[in-house]
């Protein structure tokens, strides 16, 4: 007591009395922490903070430290010619920060985000697809030939006339194939064989 300067009042000596002091709401003060911008309730003559307030302040402090670290990381990129616009947009969703309870930054960790592939999915191999494209005309032609042979045997006049028109249209299409290929080229998957124009077509026996 002798080391204290100035007179000592009786009210100031009451703070150093031994024993448990009764809680007095008038002694509750709100001391502002200018560094973190938070309010800490404390009691005169006590240096301890309330547990729930302290835990809450540490959580806020942890978030502040992590945000400041992100900003400082972007500030390092400034002036080096790096565009940080995309980084600001992608960081909140693609990057998470781990901090200790005392507000100390620990590690950066990439989130496990599902990666979507933009490449087209091939359901069939190119070889099987080409084989199917080759088999389809053969099947169609075989069915058409069988139907034509039956109609020729029956001798229906209308059927023979319709077949003649169909065959003439098919011959015209075969002659136009080279010109159509220049306007509408075939896809690379099917363009394995060079289509040659048919110069002479033998006339079919139409009765």
From Swiss-Prot:
Keyword Glycoprotein: no
CDD domains listed in its UniProt record: embe-CoV_Protein-I_like
Localisation: Virion
Entry GO terms, CC: virion component
UniProt keyword list: Virion
Pfam family, one: Corona_I
Family indicated by similarity: Belongs to the coronavirus I protein family.
Entry function: Structural protein that is not essential for the viral replication either in tissue culture or in its natural host.
Additional remarks: The gene encoding this protein is included within the N gene (alternative ORF).
Record-given protein name: Protein I
Lineage start: Viruses, Riboviria, Orthornavirae, Pisuviricota, Pisoniviricetes
Gene field: N
